[in-house]
């Protein structure tokens, strides 16, 4: 959530930056008008309350003097009615203002490239060289079926489209991958957490999914619970409504969890394979940092995600998202895109973002600065480290052999009992 004071005092700059994120000037001008009306009304209400207090004191004095106070009582009743009506109007204006402030996206950092959509993202660097096959490479969904380790047909039967069963060595490979990821992040100072897989509506508001992106989630009807779309939600809300000791920052968390997404608006996209599912595992990284350290922490977090891909020897590139392609809460985002041979392209496997104080303001996560003792909003960061299903897809395709088998990356073999190859039965 944006700082209303910043919008008010630096309106033109904020408007220009939000315009690069698709927020039209009319919306902000309407918000500005409502804010001014509210502030003017607050002044009037305070004046009326002061006048009411004066009349109340005069009534008390008249009664002590045994004087007639009917006129003053009538005047006070009129003032009270006016205050009540204005308070109701204020409540309406507050609700409108809240609707604006909670649905506006974050202000992009000055280093973010300006652009309308993903076509204007900027490649930062590449690592590794895509493999050249001397045979026709298969897509991961075909490899998974041929090796009898992924079963979409029964996933669709039991649940529906975009669900599957991992079985045998497929299930073991998935488990090996996320255990490896958690171990690597642990070496970098992240505290491993097992989170709830359901959160309440306040938590969804805190990280920015609610109210704007409610349709993308799975709510449990007649409850206050929502299936988590990412472990970012419970991990970030861990400190909601708390004041942390500045000496403890930065704090690093990591968690593996299922993620549940309705994929509203994704009809017809990635209908086969592991790229876009309603339920998938993801290892998440979350950081709580001081404002002056958060961009250094973003670079470190991105490097932590890259470390996983490098140790798996999977070619990838790092892309700086432009203003028009960033997520709602992000001030700056790097996407890591892994090479998928069957599609002859790079696909997102991680997204690392600094939300600055956007989520912290919504969730009221603050810290006490040890230097001056003041309580301040901290910065929150989040990143995938990595999406596990997409990592399975990348390994199956990049490590496939001509005989239909798949070589297991060396770093994963200790997690799979020393197994080196998944071969057709």
From Swiss-Prot:
Where is it found, in Gene Ontology cellular component terms? cytoplasm
The answer on whether this UniProt entry bears the keyword Nucleotide-binding reads yes
The GO terms describing molecular function are:
ATP binding; catalytic activity, acting on a protein; serine-tRNA ligase activity; transferase activity
EC number(s) reported in the record: 6.1.1.11
Keywords per UniProt: Aminoacyl-tRNA synthetase, ATP-binding, Cytoplasm, Ligase, Nucleotide-binding, Protein biosynthesis
What does the record list as GO biological process? selenocysteine biosynthetic process; seryl-tRNA aminoacylation
A Pfam family matched in the record: Seryl_tRNA_N
Top-level taxon of origin: Bacteria
Task: Enumerate the catalysed reactions.
Answer: tRNA(Ser) + L-serine + ATP = L-seryl-tRNA(Ser) + AMP + diphosphate + H(+); tRNA(Sec) + L-serine + ATP = L-seryl-tRNA(Sec) + AMP + diphosphate + H(+)
Location in or out of the cell? Cytoplasm
Where ATP binds, per the record, is at 261-263, 348-351
Q: Do you know which InterPro entries this protein is assigned to?
A: aa-tRNA-synt_IIb (IPR002314), aa-tRNA-synth_II (IPR006195), aa-tRNA-synth_II/BPL/LPL (IPR045864), Ser-tRNA-ligase_type_1 (IPR002317), Ser-tRNA-synth_1_N (IPR015866), SerRS_1_N_sf (IPR042103), SerRS_core (IPR033729), tRNA-bd_arm (IPR010978)
Q: In which pathway does it act?
A: Aminoacyl-tRNA biosynthesis; selenocysteinyl-tRNA(Sec) biosynthesis; L-seryl-tRNA(Sec) from L-serine and tRNA(Sec): step 1/1
What range does the record give for the signal peptide?
A: none
Chain positions recorded as L-serine binding sites? 230-232, 284, 384
Q: Which family does it belong to?
A: Belongs to the class-II aminoacyl-tRNA synthetase family. Type-1 seryl-tRNA synthetase subfamily.
Provide the domain comment.
Consists of two distinct domains, a catalytic core and a N-terminal extension that is involved in tRNA binding.
Task of the protein: Catalyzes the attachment of serine to tRNA(Ser). Is also able to aminoacylate tRNA(Sec) with serine, to form the misacylated tRNA L-seryl-tRNA(Sec), which will be further converted into selenocysteinyl-tRNA(Sec).
Q: How does it assemble?
A: Homodimer. The tRNA molecule binds across the dimer.
Q: What is this protein called?
A: Serine--tRNA ligase
Q: Which organism is it from?
A: Streptococcus gordonii (strain Challis / ATCC 35105 / BCRC 15272 / CH1 / DL1 / V288)
The organism's lineage is: Bacteria, Bacillati, Bacillota, Bacilli, Lactobacillales
């Amino acid at each position: 959530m944006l700082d209303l004071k910043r919008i008010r005092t630096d309106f033109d700059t904020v408007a220009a930056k939000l315009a690069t994120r698709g927020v039209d000037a009319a919306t902000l001008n309407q918000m500005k008008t409502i804010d001014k009306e509210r502030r003017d009304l607050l002044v009037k209400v305070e004046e009326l309350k002061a006048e009411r207090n004066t009349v109340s004191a005069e009534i008390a004095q008249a009664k002590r003097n045994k004087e007639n106070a009917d006129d003053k009582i009538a005047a006070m009743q009129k003032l009270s009615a006016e205050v009540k009506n204005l308070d109701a109007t204020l409540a309406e204006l507050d609700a409108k203002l809240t609707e604006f402030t909670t649905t506006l996206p974050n202000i992009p950092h000055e280093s973010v490239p300006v652009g309308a959509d993903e076509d204007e993202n900027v490649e930062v660097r590449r690592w590794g060289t895509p493999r050249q096959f001397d045979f026709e490479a298969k897509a991961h969904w075909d490899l998974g079926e041929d090796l009898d380790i992924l079963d979409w047909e029964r996933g669709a039967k039991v649940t529906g489209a975009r669900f599957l069963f991992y079985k045998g060595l497929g299930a073991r490979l998935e488990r090996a991958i996320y255990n490896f990821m958690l171990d690597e992040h642990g070496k970098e100072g992240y505290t491993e957490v097992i989170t709830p897989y359901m959160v309440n509506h306040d938590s969804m508001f805190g990280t920015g999914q609610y109210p704007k992106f409610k349709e993308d989630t799975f709510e449990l009807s007649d409850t206050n619970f929502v299936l988590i779309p990412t472990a970012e939600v419970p991990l970030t809300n861990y400190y909601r409504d708390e004041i942390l000791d500045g000496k403890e920052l930065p704090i690093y968390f990591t968690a593996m969890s299922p993620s549940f997404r309705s994929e509203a608006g994704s009809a017809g996209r990635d209908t086969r394979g592991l790229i876009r599912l309603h339920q998938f595992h993801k290892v998440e990284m979350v950081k709580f940092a001081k404002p002056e350290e958060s961009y250094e922490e973003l670079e470190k977090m991105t490097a932590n995600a890259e470390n996983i891909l490098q140790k798996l020897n999977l070619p990838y590139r790092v892309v700086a998202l432009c203003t028009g392609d960033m997520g709602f809460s992000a001030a700056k985002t790097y996407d890591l895109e892994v090479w998928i041979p069957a599609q002859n392209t790079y696909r997102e496997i991680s997204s690392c973002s600094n939300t600055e104080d956007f989520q912290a303001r919504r969730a009221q996560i603050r810290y006490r600065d040890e230097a001056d003792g003041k309580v301040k909003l901290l910065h929150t960061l989040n990143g995938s480290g990595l999406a596990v299903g997409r990592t399975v897809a990348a390994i199956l395709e990049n490590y496939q052999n001509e005989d239909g088998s798949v070589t297991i990356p060396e770093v994963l073999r200790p997690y799979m009992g020393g197994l080196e190859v998944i071969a057709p039965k």
